[in-house]
Amino acid sequence: MILPFSTQFTCPVQDNGFSPSSLLSHCKRDRFEVTSLRYDSFGSVKTASSSKWNVMRSRRNVKAFGLVDKLGKKVWRKKEEDSDSEDEEDEVKEETFGGKEASLDDPVERREWRKTIREVIDKHPDIEEDEEIDMVEKRRKMQKLLADYPLVVNEEDPNWPEDADGWGFSFNQFFNKITIKNEKKEEEDDDEDSEGDDSEKEIVWQDDNYIRPIKDLTTAEWEEAVFKDISPLMVLVHNRYKRPKENEKFREELEKAIQVIWNCGLPSPRCVAVDAVVETDLVSALKVSVFPEIIFTKAGKILYREKGIRTADELSKIMAFFYYGAAKPPCLNGVVNSQEQIPLVDVSVN
């Protein structure tokens, strides 16, 4: 059955010359969803409805983005205004302080300062000359010091002192000579002093050589110390480089032992110290190879050699046994008294 009237539906997209591929790309670019590209009535209606919904959603997104953009612009404008105000404050501060600096950098003021400085220099013309003289004097003194005390010394120098051996001086040169004399006051002086204040009395000094328990001995002094005086003598042979701690400790213990004898009211024996590094000939004559070592002598003979480190109490008992007739201490059990002769040492004269 054929109806008298026929209806045709034409797609507007196709009539306008658009291809399906261009329509698809356009819809994808605008984020529209197209479910069907058929150009029938049902497809066109469905496409129109979905596109309408997507257009509404895109409008909402545009409005939201617009609000965010407006808020961001407001915040940025506020920050910009704050920074502008801070810059203005800094400029004001610079202007306030710049006035003072400008006054200091004024060329007229600088000329005045230079003029006053020149006037002061002209009033005292000897200042620069004195400085030059001082520099010349300093240079002369420095050259003299370098000549007297050279920084580099040749070890093979024939004028090198034997007692120095790297030290540059010997302790005996400070303590061996009596530099202070004991002088008695006259009666007239005593009467005059008694009339005045008692606090202003002269102090009588005594040299350090009288109170030192151990005295340093050289090879040149050996013969006089041993053979001219036959009283008891103890010889401490030490080495400053070999076992330095033990050498120092042994010397301290020996000084304490001598102090014990003093406290007992007895005259302590003489005690000398020989430096093995300096007095090599004397050490070889004494046949000492282990340091430290103490040799007990009396009347030109060697009574005992102590090579171990003893305490002050043990050393005081050994001294009491050999020199004061005390009982034999336990530390000397099994030790036989030797009668070794004290050796002679030839002192070569340069």
From Swiss-Prot:
SUPFAM superfamilies the UniProt entry points to: Thioredoxin-like (SSF52833)
GO BP annotation list: chloroplast organization; regulation of DNA-templated transcription
Record keywords, A-Z: Chloroplast, Nucleus, Plastid, Transit peptide
Cellular component GO terms, alphabetical: chloroplast stroma; nucleus
Gene3D superfamilies for the chain: Glutaredoxin
Function according to Swiss-Prot or TrEMBL: Plays an essential role in early steps of chloroplast development. Involved in the regulation of plastid gene expression. Required for the proper function of the plastid transcriptional machinery and protein accumulation in thylakoid membranes. May function as molecular chaperone to ensure proper organization of the nucleoids in chloroplasts. Is a necessary component of phytochrome signaling for photosynthesis-associated plastid-encoded genes (PhAPGs) activation. Mediates the degradation of two repressors of chloroplast biogenesis, PIF1 and PIF3 in nucleus.
Protein name: Thioredoxin-like fold domain-containing protein MRL7L, chloroplastic
Organism name: Arabidopsis thaliana
